[in-house]
């Protein structure tokens, strides 16, 4: 008798393998064939972290007590360093104990936030064009995807007239993967923008906060690139009242040349963070202590290090 075929879960039919995972395989295959490839796949800094970061990692890794399980919500040292980072660069006050949460990269945070705020069948507002994981994870979790457009003639900023039409239900068919709920639960935004390069604008952040407050929608700003395009570092949490209705992701991948370390964070009000932590604590068990303490050390990098490693280096390459 033939064995009965085992089938995957239905949700896998909704998505493909991660876009950049597929592209990296393609690039690796072409390199193996001897072709000279300029990879335009995932954006991965090719410069190292600061020397003090590497030295701290080695120091902690040699400590006998460094290799056990760590707190899911991160070590106090890392949380305090993240709070200090926001105060230093954005002039935003965050309680290190309750208003931020370390992540194993921002991509993990997209999953946790969607699980914490979105029920199956709810609608999620996703930028088009935009980072593909906002769409794929929302689909896996049974949400309706509603795209809002970013246009070059508008500096790749949201069209708030379109957003108002979507929320009012006057354009229910645009970009959906199912019936549009009366009010979307979540809006994803990302500035500086990937893939367009559109720059963050404080007036956009102010409009997003106003939109969130008026419609009871949580705005999630994915902010890993604020050290790349300019010396003006902006955060949506700089807007008064933003913490009550917004969540912001930040990451050390681009700002500190640490993409492989998988260290990110989310920041918001204490209640939102507690909901996200409830999800996170049931999925993962913390990050290696050496990585956490070395990341805390990296947050101490000098202004000069950031200027040379980020602003000047990328500015020179754009002129090449």
Residue ranges and their predicted role:
Residues 2-105, 112, 298-301:
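N-terminal small-domain helix-loop-helix segment of the aminotransferase-like
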Residues 23, 27, 134, 208, ...:
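Aromatic/hydrophobic pocket-lining residues that form π-stacking "cages" and hydrophobic walls in ligand
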Residues 33, 141, 214-215:
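Helix C-cap/helix->beta junction micro-motif
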Residues 116-138:
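Conserved PLP-anchoring active-site segment centered on the Schiff-base-forming lysine
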Residues 146, 150-234:
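Active-site phosphate-binding strand-loop segment of PLP-dependent enzymes
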Residues 164-168, 313-320:
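Short, intrinsically disordered, charge-balanced linker/junction segments flanking boundaries
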Residues 241-315:
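Conserved core segment of the aminotransferase class I/II
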């Amino acid at each position: 008798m033939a064995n009965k075929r085992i089938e995957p879960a239905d949700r896998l039919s909704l998505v493909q393998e991660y876009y950049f995972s597929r592209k990296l395989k393609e690039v690796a295959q072409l390199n193996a064939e001897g072709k000279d490839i300029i990879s335009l796949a995932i954006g991965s800094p090719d410069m190292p972290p600061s020397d003090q970061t590497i030295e701290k990692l080695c120091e902690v890794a040699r400590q006998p007590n460094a290799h056990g399980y760590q707190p899911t919500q991160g070590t106090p040292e890392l949380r305090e360093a993240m709070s200090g980072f926001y105060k230093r660069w954005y002039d935003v006050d965050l309680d290190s104990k309750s208003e931020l949460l370390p992540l194993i990269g921002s991509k993990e945070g997209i999953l946790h936030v969607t699980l914490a705020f979105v029920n199956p069948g709810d609608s999620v507002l996703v930028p088009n064009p935009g980072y593909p994981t906002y769409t794929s994870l929302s689909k896996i979790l049974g949400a309706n995807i509603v795209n809002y457009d970013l246009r070059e003639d508008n500096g790749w900023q949201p069209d708030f007239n379109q957003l108002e039409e979507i929320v009012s239900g006057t354009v229910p068919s645009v970009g959906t993967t199912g019936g549009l709920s009366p009010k979307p639960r979540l809006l994803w935004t990302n500035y500086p923008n990937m893939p367009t390069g559109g720059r963050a604008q404080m007036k956009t952040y102010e409009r997003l906060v106003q939109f969130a407050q008026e419609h009871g929608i949580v705005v999630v700003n994915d902010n890993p690139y604020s050290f790349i395009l300019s010396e003006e570092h902006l955060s949506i949490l700089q807007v008064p009242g933003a913490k009550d209705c917004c969540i912001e992701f930040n990451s050390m991948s681009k700002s500190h040349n640490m993409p492989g370390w998988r260290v990110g964070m989310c920041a918001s009000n204490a209640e939102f963070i507690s909901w996200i932590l409830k999800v996170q604590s049931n999925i993962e068990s913390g990050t290696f202590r050496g990585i956490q303490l070395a990341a805390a050390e990296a947050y101490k990098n000098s202004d000069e290090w950031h200027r040379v490693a980020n602003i000047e280096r990328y500015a020179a390459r754009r002129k090449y």
